[in-house]
Amino acid sequence: MALFPVASEQPISRPAIANLTIIGLNVFMFLLEIILGDSFINSWAFTPAHLTAFFNGTGSFQAVLTIFTAMFMHASFSHIFGNMVFLWVFGQAIENAFGSRPYTTFYLVCGVAANMAQYLIDPNSTVPNLGASGAIAGVMGAYLALYPTSTIDLFVWPLSLFTHRDIRVPAWLMLGLWFAVQVTLGGNGMTEAGAAGGVAYFAHIGGFVTGLVLALLVRPDERRLLSAA
């Protein structure tokens, strides 16, 4: 069984241009991966051991750049498709809350925090990390902080195919359970992105916590409005 968010009830007051641009950049980078192959992926994915080598004075500055480039890369079509669906559903509301430029900065900060969280777990790992999941987890954390009672429509595979309807759940339930799963799997010894099918659980945890905390700090007015509603 697989769950995908397909819609949020949170009203969107203006087009989420930055979010669409980020989605476009992810698609562009994925096309480059297909065209240029493994050499491009290995050069621009984030490998913790390469960053450790840079800190030790034996590596290239490119290792620092990969902290950013890796968050726009993906391992497969299903990987990028799933990530972009989550980003589309949750990113629009967060961009509307923050504004386009602050949202872009917020997204990048969450992505960096996610990669560094994974790095701290195993700084000598030679497994390349790639994917927008950590940055998107930050967007999800912000959504939980700002709109916990908003309703999320979930497509449940294969149930929704037979019932022809989605399941509606409050954001706090869906996002809270999602985070609990990441913590549980991360705590079961998942110390590398290459473990358990290539999922960087600690990147998800780091990104989510960063996004949640930043949203609570930057947008206290949103929380006051929610409390008064």
Where are these regions (language model features)?
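A detector for small-residue-rich transmembrane helices and their helix-helix packing motifs
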Residues: 1-229
